[in-house]
């Protein structure tokens, strides 16, 4: 996908009746963002990147439906968690449910990281209000599709050189991309 192209539509599927369609969760991740994290792997992805680390998450009808409140209870049950990561699949395909969940997580002092095959520019150019709401709740966005030709195992928190770690609040405030600098 062309990162300068306006994103006019992001397929909003997978969620049903306020529930989230997920492939699974990891209760104690240290690889899906900084700190000790709870990771939610959403189900459904339109990108189907060759070499994807999670190809089982591509099917929009796969996975299972869960109540966001159940995930919230699991997260809050662990006082050691520093944040929650939305991965996939493509989280922005279930933007409305995730935006509401992210707002509750923020209220409880947790930060939000989100992996997306869309670029920051595509997301900010998207017309769906729910996509904008989710983006406003994200602290760090790992953007862009995984590109096998740019695979780089030395990168922190990303798989290929085209992907960026973006400080979303600073980027939204400045009107341009502000890269996030990992600690250490």
Locate predicted features.
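Conserved C-terminal portion of the radical SAM core fold
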Residues: 78-86, 142-148, 172-184
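Receiver (REC) domain switch/active-site residues of two-component response regulators
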Residues: 139
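Conserved Radical SAM active-site core
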Residues: 13, 17-24, 36, 54-134
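Glycine-centered loop/turn positions within well-structured domains
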Residues: 47
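P-loop/Walker A phosphate-binding loop and immediately adjacent motor/lid segment at beta-alpha junctions
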Residues: 94-106, 113, 151-184
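N-terminal [4Fe-4S]-dependent radical SAM core
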Residues: 2-41, 50, 54-60, 177-178, ...
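Short Gly/Pro-enriched loop/turn and capping motifs at secondary-structure junctions
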Residues: 119-121, 146-150
